[in-house]
Amino acid sequence: MAQLTALDAGFLKSRDPERHPGLAIGAVAVVNGAAPSYDQLKTVLTERIKSIPRCTQVLATEWIDYPGFDLTQHVRRVALPRPGDEAELFRAIALALERPLDPDRPLWECWIIEGLNGNRWAILIKIHHCMAGAMSAAHLLARLCDDADGSAFANNVDIKQIPPYGDARSWAETLWRMSVSIAGAVCTAAARAVSWPAVTSPAGPVTTRRRYQAVRVPRDAVDAVCHKFGVTANDVALAAITEGFRTVLLHRGQQPRADSLRTLEKTDGSSAMLPYLPVEYDDPVRRLRTVHNRSQQSGRRQPDSLSDYTPLMLCAKMIHALARLPQQGIVTLATSAPRPRHQLRLMGQKMDQVLPIPPTALQLSTGIAVLSYGDELVFGITADYDAASEMQQLVNGIELGMARLVALSDDSVLLFTKDRRKASSRALPSAARRGRPSVPTARARH
């Protein structure tokens, strides 16, 4: 038996009596080839699941083995209507997220989704966040693969850091350690709740219905932005997310302000920070620099995780306090992950895509997770169904934010910073400095 952490116990004591489904997180793999038969799938899952921690245990005052574990209670099978395109897949993912996990059984589900176009099928792994401290959804997915290598999603971001902007505390340490990220931020957020400004967010009342969408970006394009500006993939992703929410606010006729949106952002294995997204800036480079600087500053001053030192009952009370906060307190959760070390295969078939699924937990109405797989960086987005009428605006804004940064990362674009302008000024005669026109602050092409 394994002892619960303070965070696990806190969430257990604060469990939503209506079994709100938002505390589930997951990952979806799109697999090439025909879907296996139920008997084939059952044989493989039975063989591989029982060796994975937590998958045959239940959560009480500690993790205990579940008597009479039955795999069939955890496997669901659905078929997409024609044409079986991406939109239908996203609807199926949202449907799976709406179904709450049974707290009296092991806290995970596996959904087999058939009927994808191009002779493909998908497997969705959904777990409760309390399992994520020991086994993430992506790690669980990797353990189900043919090589059963739990290190497939190990830290291997492969982004070269350019001094002096390299940040050892990049938020890519693991994809789905969400129980620690969310709950650590929950405790911090509850303590700061009184000082939060009242803002209008692109979110409304939390419902049990969900929407899901994904945005894909070529990884080479992200790498080019990182090298051009000396930032991390985390910074690039958050800057694109910022453009997405700025687009939503402008679409609603609201003026983006410096205090419009907070984001829960992972900093290490045991803590989280709550910086504001700089939605007030229209200049994409200024947004990127601001995100980078705030990430570094927040990482340096972030204290040790409250979860390691908070009494169980106090942690539960803090979580309850956050649950009662106005919906606009926090509106987005940004997470990230390294790419798998190798191409994954399941039952002899290649995994073509892997999509991350963030939670919309408690009062976090919109979640955005980022995962790198193959040659793509994927933004997975979940939102309350009724509170996400502008989800397409959010998607469009993320795509626009990435497109603007990629265009600016081209080698033919010169960026003029204050240091560059000062150096240029010193190189000119004093008379020329007095008479020359001012240098534009944006960029010049040559």
From Swiss-Prot:
<dbReference type="InterPro" id="IPR045034">
    <property type="entry name" value="O-acyltransferase_WSD1-like"/>
</dbReference>
<dbReference type="GO" id="GO:0005886">
    <property type="term" value="C:plasma membrane"/>
</dbReference>
<protein>
    <recommendedName>
        <fullName>Putative diacyglycerol O-acyltransferase MT3481</fullName>
        <ecNumber>2.3.1.20</ecNumber>
    </recommendedName>
</protein>
<comment type="pathway">
    <text>Glycerolipid metabolism; triacylglycerol biosynthesis.</text>
</comment>
<dbReference type="GO" id="GO:0006071">
    <property type="term" value="P:glycerol metabolic process"/>
</dbReference>
<keyword id="KW-0319">Glycerol metabolism</keyword>
<dbReference type="GO" id="GO:0001666">
    <property type="term" value="P:response to hypoxia"/>
</dbReference>
<dbReference type="InterPro" id="IPR023213">
    <property type="entry name" value="CAT-like_dom_sf"/>
</dbReference>
<keyword id="KW-0012">Acyltransferase</keyword>
<dbReference type="GO" id="GO:0019432">
    <property type="term" value="P:triglyceride biosynthetic process"/>
</dbReference>
<dbReference type="InterPro" id="IPR009721">
    <property type="entry name" value="O-acyltransferase_WSD1_C"/>
</dbReference>
<dbReference type="Pfam" id="PF06974">
    <property type="entry name" value="WS_DGAT_C"/>
</dbReference>
<keyword id="KW-0443">Lipid metabolism</keyword>
<dbReference type="Pfam" id="PF03007">
    <property type="entry name" value="WS_DGAT_cat"/>
</dbReference>
<dbReference type="GO" id="GO:0051701">
    <property type="term" value="P:biological process involved in interaction with host"/>
</dbReference>
<feature type="active site" description="Proton acceptor">
    <location>
        <position position="129"/>
    </location>
</feature>
<dbReference type="GO" id="GO:0004144">
    <property type="term" value="F:diacylglycerol O-acyltransferase activity"/>
</dbReference>
<dbReference type="InterPro" id="IPR004255">
    <property type="entry name" value="O-acyltransferase_WSD1_N"/>
</dbReference>
<feature type="region of interest" description="Disordered">
    <location>
        <begin position="425"/>
        <end position="446"/>
    </location>
</feature>
<keyword id="KW-0444">Lipid biosynthesis</keyword>
<keyword id="KW-0808">Transferase</keyword>
<dbReference type="GO" id="GO:0071731">
    <property type="term" value="P:response to nitric oxide"/>
</dbReference>
<comment type="similarity">
    <text>Belongs to the long-chain O-acyltransferase family.</text>
</comment>
<dbReference type="InterPro" id="IPR014292">
    <property type="entry name" value="Acyl_transf_WS/DGAT"/>
</dbReference>
